[in-house]
């Protein structure tokens, strides 16, 4: 069985070379990583009531929710998991999470590394977030379960921080990038989306060309294509290839951050693992003829996060 999970940045040759340099000590000890995905609403992150959209008004509710999957936490983890996982995962990679071939996923921290301090995924998250705008320009209410801005501080067992900033609001400053800071230098590994990825290292704290100590030496290939090339090569040549655990671990990091923002609480790794289910009735889902795992209120709205009020689950 060969399993790819769609984290295409992990297949970037430029990022891979940079991750190796960082693990060799090129910027000293890693102390901080920053990731940003801030732009206007995209895909199905914003939804108005089903009955207000002619193309959806006659669909079964479950089918509509799947069509608008970014709007529902049960269906996708919301825009947080679907959008931000790539930036967050590539930062964890630079820290050393799941280095090497796809079979080396990271696993349990004590079993694999022997010491919790060397666990290269975050163990805690605290976050803020909210929904600034509750209606579109036509005055129609948004009924999705997403916030339109998130700020998350992840903490590693050794004290390293990963800061992530996400926003889906029109008219604001846009940034789509990831950076890493060490005791001896600074690095950039995405600057304007997931590709191209101008991976480079510098002395100091800024990407000053005069202080550049390394950059990816080859012509960069497209990681969206590379992930397929790698999977198909494994299939054709029967190479070990299973990204499932690594993808699950990256998803769990996202779950921690999203839950921290939606509940207003600090969330530890085990808290996220043992949290109340996102959709208590999901196991009863039998198809498009059954009830949706989350049901609309009379006005078409859905249960939404209430930080500080709903503390033990997200909605």
Features from the language model and the residues they span:
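Predominantly a Rossmann-like dinucleotide-binding segment in NAD(P)-dependent oxidoreductases
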Residues: 1-143, 170-172, 177-179, 186, ...
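Short, surface-exposed connector motifs at secondary-structure boundaries
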Residues: 1-3, 160, 238-240
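Short catalytic-loop micro-motif centered on adjacent basic/acidic residues
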Residues: 3-6, 163, 243-244
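C-terminal helical cap and adjacent loop that interface with cofactors, partners, or active-site loops
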Residues: 58, 62-63, 76-113, 120, ...
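Active-site Gly/Thr loop motif
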Residues: 131, 151-154
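Flexible, glycine/threonine-enriched loop-and-boundary segments that flank and lead into catalytic domains
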Residues: 137, 159-169
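Intrinsic-disorder/low-complexity loop/linker signature
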Residues: 139-140, 159, 210, 300
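Glycine-centered tight beta-turn/hairpin loop motif at sheet-sheet or coil-to-beta transitions
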Residues: 157-161, 184-185
């Amino acid at each position: 069985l060969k399993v790819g999970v769609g984290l295409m940045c992990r297949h970037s040759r430029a990022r891979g070379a940079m991750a190796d340099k960082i693990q060799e000590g090129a910027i000293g000890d890693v102390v901080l990583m920053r990731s940003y995905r801030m732009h206007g609403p995209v895909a199905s992150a914003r939804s108005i009531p089903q009955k207000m959209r002619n193309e959806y008004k006659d669909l079964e509710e479950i089918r509509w929710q799947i069509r608008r999957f970014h709007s529902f936490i049960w269906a996708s983890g919301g825009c947080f998991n679907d959008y931000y996982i790539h930036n967050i995962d590539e930062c964890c990679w630079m820290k050393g999470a799941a280095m090497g071939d796809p079979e080396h996923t990271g696993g349990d921290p004590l079993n694999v590394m022997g010491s919790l301090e060397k666990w290269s995924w975050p163990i805690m998250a605290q976050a803020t977030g909210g929904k600034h705008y509750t209606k579109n320009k036509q005055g129609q209410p948004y009924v999705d379960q997403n916030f339109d801005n998130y700020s998350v501080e992840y903490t590693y067992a050794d004290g390293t921080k990963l800061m992530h900033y996400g926003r889906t609001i029109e008219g604001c400053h846009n940034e789509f990038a990831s950076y890493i800071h060490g005791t001896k230098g600074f690095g950039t590994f995405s600057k304007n989306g997931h590709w191209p990825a101008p991976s480079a290292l510098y002395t100091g704290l800024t990407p000053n060309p005069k202080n550049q100590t390394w950059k990816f030496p080859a012509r960069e290939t497209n990681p969206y294509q590379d992930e397929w090339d790698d999977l198909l090569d494994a299939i054709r040549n029967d190479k070990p290839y299973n990204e499932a655990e690594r993808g699950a671990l990256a998803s769990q990091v996202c779950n921690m951050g999203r839950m921290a923002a939606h509940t207003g609480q600090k969330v530890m790794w085990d808290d996220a693992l043992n949290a109340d289910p996102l959709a208590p009735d999901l196991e009863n889902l039998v198809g498009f003829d059954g009830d949706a795992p989350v049901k609309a209120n009379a006005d078409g709205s859905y249960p939404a996060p209430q930080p500080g009020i709903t503390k033990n689950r997200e909605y």
